[in-house]
């Protein structure tokens, strides 16, 4: 692996083109990735930390960027859910390789209200509703048991909507720091950090690559 290298050829990131609001800048980058039909343009690598300080990470899908923060949905009883309950400080990274772009978000995760979770769950495909309802996420389970539970719930609810399980819902990550990275030749990458100030405004600065 030591000989695997990627040279970047993009023009980089011009500070004057950055929005003063990093959440709006994040929307721009995600929208551009979606419009370019990149694979999984809304995928984030979410890092959480357990009560004893052990970090873990996994890929989840971002489902919204609002004025307050970034929203995703999951099982509250999963490992990430339990770790967020113990320590709501989280971080995630988004990487769009064809664009030589990376975004890092640091903040705290808060549960969204039940109405928002209900609304999104109802919008999911029927099969996704069923699998979410039966899955004891992050717990040991055999394939046979999972398939039997799917069959049982499909008989109980042969069509959508399936009731949203209480242990499934959304989180909104309220950011305190957002970084935007853009690859450039010779590893002289562009990197800008926004830090939220006490008055709610954002301060932007360039970081060395």
Swiss-Prot record:
Assembly notes: Homodimer.
UniProt organism field: Alcanivorax borkumensis (strain ATCC 700651 / DSM 11573 / NCIMB 13689 / SK2)
Top enzyme class: oxidoreductase
A Pfam family matched in the record: PNPOx_N
GO MF entry, a single one: pyridoxamine phosphate oxidase activity
GO BP annotations, alphabetical order: pyridoxine biosynthetic process
Family label: Belongs to the pyridoxamine 5'-phosphate oxidase family.
Necessary cofactors: FMN
Database matches in InterPro entries: Pyridox_Oxase (IPR000659), Pyridox_Oxase_N (IPR011576), Pyridoxamine_oxidase_dimer_C (IPR019576), Split_barrel_FMN-bd (IPR012349)
Biological role stated in the UniProt entry: Catalyzes the oxidation of either pyridoxine 5'-phosphate (PNP) or pyridoxamine 5'-phosphate (PMP) into pyridoxal 5'-phosphate (PLP).
Domain of life per record: Bacteria
Alphabetized Gene3D superfamilies for the sequence: Electron Transport, Fmn-binding Protein, Chain A
The protein's name in its UniProt record: Pyridoxine/pyridoxamine 5'-phosphate oxidase
Pathway where it operates: Cofactor metabolism; pyridoxal 5'-phosphate salvage; pyridoxal 5'-phosphate from pyridoxamine 5'-phosphate: step 1/1; Cofactor metabolism; pyridoxal 5'-phosphate salvage; pyridoxal 5'-phosphate from pyridoxine 5'-phosphate: step 1/1
Reactions accelerated catalytically: pyridoxamine 5'-phosphate + O2 + H2O = pyridoxal 5'-phosphate + H2O2 + NH4(+); pyridoxine 5'-phosphate + O2 = pyridoxal 5'-phosphate + H2O2
Cofactor stoichiometry and binding remark: Binds 1 FMN per subunit.
